[in-house]
UniProtKB/Swiss-Prot annotation:
EC number(s) stated in the UniProt entry for this protein: 6.1.1.4
Domain of life: Bacteria
Protein name per the record: Leucine--tRNA ligase
Pfam families: Anticodon_1, tRNA-synt_1, tRNA-synt_1_2, tRNA-synt_1g
Biological-process GO terms, alphabetical: leucyl-tRNA aminoacylation
Length: 859
């Protein structure tokens, strides 16, 4: 055995073995319990970053652990390869998105292999290939036939100069990223999938996701946003028109003093015909944001329409205002405004001198709305026949009255909106719909699928090549001329079903149901919590669509979800001559000084610039604080990087990248290597005989089996990989101090090392593979079994008791494991050191903590 640990040499050899033996390629096996482990697949941006490495190391640890449990483990990988970044890169590099993407895939694939991840590469998929998106297109046509797909106009960001649609990321400070023209909102026809048809089931089934983090489940519940309320009809004074409003607080209905409608509401547009101020306001609103986050913080503005609404119960007239905080695509585009009991309505009323009336008061205490609205539930007053009712009583009484008079109905609403899947981009899967010469829109016939996206294109940075090329859209259906849809799918479409395609990636159908139902649902899914409300909801939705199409049997796509934390690194910058910040890579910082609390007080880069330290921040290009995994692998080896990733932090929390920690992980592996090397060099022919062990040898063996028990639980149940590593490190300290003089000494070390390399195999597989062979095992470590705890080794013959006198440790005594308190007290009092401290004093109290501590209080 080599005395020195040489990571680059052993990692290359082990990876070649895995490749040549197709170690991680799997097929369905009815005789073995399956385990499907999946990490969210990467976008092929060009290089792996440390966030990828953390995600994929966690997945690999879980997969390898389950393999040694004897399970049939599937761990696939692929590429989420459509998307806007490829278009931008193609424009900048004067190429097309396809070659840029495929080149990146090859580079990143080699990076993944260097890190030693145990993937079944035979199942690799790239979502930008027709072999993949063909089935997505096919499925979309089936959803259309089931009535789950429809087209309607929706608002997009529009650059009037380039005459093109912009993604949200391409709008910078309200202007086009390319030409700096102010961006407008434009209504264009787009395709939608009816996720709202599954809202109730998506919400209810959250309760079945026992293996998902509570935070993700709460976020999804809030995103779906089920509410019970009343939809009521308000008339419009002086006309036969009416409009609907939905509220979850009908108890406040008697306090309505005005109604707010969206700028795009038909009533606002009607009133604007004779109201120039309103017409101008509507135009301004067309070009403003529609995101909820921005609506919450922006200035609330409005214009009186001159119209009045008729209260559905009192008949009282209240003014109708057009307001910028009401959106047409949320609810009915109109809200009843109760400034006495809603803070936004209150602030708007104060701004525009509108009446504020209180109709709810606290059950106990005084009502005060002089400074703010009273928004809690309480008891009704100033509400006529409803005075004295609490929230529930008022809800029911008011709802019943509205229903009886034909002016309202009880209704369950959802915050969730249907999924708009149209994108006016090029680099995505073409939407498989065509428009016939007579204007009829139909799905692309199955025998014409896939609708292939042309890859040999020129990107001008303005218009999608398939929109610019009028010939591409021309096709024929059943002998009739037709035009193809030139929008492409939202890239969340591809990532909503990739997990299922892995089960049968070469199948000449969307899924092979037999294979899909063997592997699905995913047993362990791993990815960032930032995907909680988009990808992870679409992922669940698509699974239910697949189920209802008869392709899968299960209700949910993944049993367990682990959301790993971000990777942080130090961030430094200096200010250049032009006053701009120049961010410097931590690898280029040559001098740092720290105070006594470890805080950086001074930093200088390799060019001599004195730097400002901004603390630990998420690794990012913008702050230039990303650490290239490949550089670290070349310097320390893949196993060291993997070990640091698992040891530095619990998986759900942020991980602070510290090269000193990486060096520590590297030293630990070298210690393990040396211990194994020293052991192998000796005569290890004597077999372990537990009947011959001394108490010291039994104690060491007990530590070995306690460690096996802890690591098994930490990885398998708790998923606390950091404490699993810490337990092995602690055991290593015991092993390094242990004598290796007798045959039984060495037999215990041999048993320990054989266990340790398997315990660490999921985390540092190259080292473990090599040491397993060096320790004389004839089978491959991948074909071995996870170490089993010898329960008899955990039984203690004796216990070490700490003896304190007046709170200070004075002695340690060994007692029989089953010794009672009287025996322990007698032995403790008889100890020479204890006698010395009890001389001339009176024992007042003796406290015994069984098996651990004897505390004597004396004065």
């Amino acid at each position: 055995m080599q005395e020195q640990y040489n990571p680059s040499e052993i990692e290359a050899l082990v990876q070649k073995h895995w490749h040549d033996n197709k170690t991680f390629e799997v097929t369905e096996d009815a005789n073995k319990e399956k385990f499907y482990c999946l990490s969210m697949f990467p976008y092929p941006s060009g290089r792996l970053h440390m966030g990828h490495v953390r995600n994929y190391t966690i997945g690999d640890v879980v997969a390898r652990f389950q393999r040694l449990q004897g399970k049939n483990v599937l761990q696939p990988i692929g590429w989420d390869s459509f998307g806007l970044p490829a278009e931008n890169a193609a424009i900048n590099n004067k190429t097309a998105p396809a070659p840029w993407t495929y080149q990146n895939i090859e580079y990143m694939k080699n990076q993944l292999k260097l890190l030693g991840f145990g993937y079944d590469w035979s199942r690799e998929i790239a979502t930008c290939t027709p072999e993949y998106y063909r089935w997505e297109q096919w499925f979309f046509t089936k959803l259309y036939e089931k009535g789950l797909v429809y087209k309607k106009t929706a608002s997009v960001n529009w650059c009037p100069n380039d005459e093109t649609v912009l993604a949200n990321e391409q709008v910078q400070d309200g202007c086009c990223w390319r030409c700096d023209t102010p961006v407008e909102q434009k209504e264009i026809p787009q395709w939608f999938i009816k996720i709202t048809a599954y809202a109730e089931e998506l919400l209810n089934d959250i309760d079945t996701l026992d293996g998902w983090p509570e935070q993700v489940k709460t976020m999804q519940r809030n995103w779906i946003g089920r509410s019970e309320g009343v939809e009521m009809t308000f008339g419009v004074a002086g006309s036969d028109k009416s409009f609907d409003i939905y509220t979850t607080r009908p108890d406040t209905l008697m306090g309505v003093t005005y109604v707010a409608i969206a700028a795009g509401h038909p009533l606002a547009e009607l009133a604007a015909q004779t109201n120039p101020e309103l017409a101008q306001f509507i135009e301004e609103c067309k070009n403003s944001t529609t995101s909820e986050a921005d609506l919450a913080t922006m200035e609330k503005r409005g214009v009186a329409t001159g119209l009045y609404a008729i209260h559905p119960i009192t008949g009282k007239q209240v003014p109708i205002w057009a307001a910028n905080f009401v959106l047409m695509n949320y609810g009915t585009g109109a809200v009843m405004s109760v400034p006495g009991h809603d803070q936004r309505d209150y602030e708007f009323a104060k701004k525009y001198n509108l009446p504020i009336e209180a109709v709810i008061k606290p059950v106990d205490g005084e009502l005060d709305i002089s400074e703010a609205a009273y928004t809690e539930k309480g008891v009704l007053f100033n509400s006529g026949e409803f005075d004295g009712l609490d929230f529930d009583g008022a809800f029911n009484a008011i709802a019943d009255k509205l229903v009886a008079e034909g002016k309202g109905k009880r209704q369950v609403n959802y915050r969730l909106r249907d999924w708009g899947v149209s994108r006016q981009r090029y680099w995505g899967a073409p939407i498989p719909m065509v428009t016939l010469a007579d204007g009829t829109v139909i799905p692309t016939p199955e025998d014409q699928l896939p609708v292939i996206l042309p890859e040999d294109v020129v990107m001008d940075g303005i218009q999608s090549p398939i929109k610019a090329d009028k010939e591409w859209a021309k096709t024929q259906v059943n002998g009739q001329d037709a035009l193809r849809e030139t929008d492409t799918f939202d890239t969340f479409m591809e990532s909503s079903w990739y997990y299922a395609r892995y089960c049968s990636p070469q199948a000449d159908q969307m899924l092979d149901p037999t294979k899909a139902n063997y592997w699905l649902p995913v047993d362990q899914y791993i990815g960032g919590i930032e995907h909680a409300c988009m990808h992870l909801l679409y992922f669940r939705f698509f699974h239910k669509l697949l189920r209802d199409a008869g392709l899968v049997n299960s209700n949910e796509p993944a049993k367990q979800l682990l959301t790993q934390g971000m990777v942080l690194a130090d961030a430094f910058y200096y200010t250049n001559d032009k006053g701009a910040r120049v961010w410097v890579s931590p690898l280029d910082v040559v001098t740092t000084e720290k105070d006594d609390k470890g805080r950086v007080t001074k930093a200088i880069d390799k060019d001599g610039n004195e730097l400002v330290y901004t603390g630990m921040c998420k690794m990012s290009k913008s702050k230039n604080n990303g650490i290239d995994p490949q550089v670290m692998v070349e310097k320390y080896g893949a196993d060291t990087v993997r070990l640091f990733m698992m040891f530095a932090s619990p998986p759900e929390l942020t991980l602070e990248w510290q090269e000193s920690g990486v060096e520590g992980a590297h030293r630990f592996i070298k210690r393990l290597w040396k211990l194994a090397s020293d052991y192998v060099a000796q005569d290890n022919s004597e077999a372990l005989d537990v009947s011959k062990l001394t108490s010291e040898q039994k104690a060491l063996r007990r530590e070995v089996h306690k460690t096996i028990a802890k690591v098994t639980d930490d990885i398998g149940r708790r998923q606390m990989f950091n404490t699993a590593v810490a337990a092995v490190m602690e055991l290593m300290n015991h092993l390094q101090k242990a004598p290796q003089t007798t045959g039984q000494d060495r037999a215990i070390i041999g048993e320990a090392l054989t266990a340790v390399v398997r315990l660490l195999y999921p985390i540092i597989p190259h080292v473990s593979f090599t040491l397993w062979n060096e320790l004389g095992n004839t089978n491959s470590i991948e074909d071995s079994q996870w170490p089993v705890v010898d329960e008899s080794a955990l039984v203690e013959d004796s216990k070490l008791i700490v003896v304190q006198v007046n709170g200070k440790v004075r002695a340690k005594i060994t007692v029989a494991a089953d010794a009672d308190q009287a025996s322990v007290e007698a032995l403790g009092m008889a100890d020479e050191q204890v006698i010395k401290y009890l001389d001339g004093v009176t024992v007042r109290k003796v406290i015994y903590v069984p098996g651990k501590l004897l505390s004597i209080v004396a004065n």
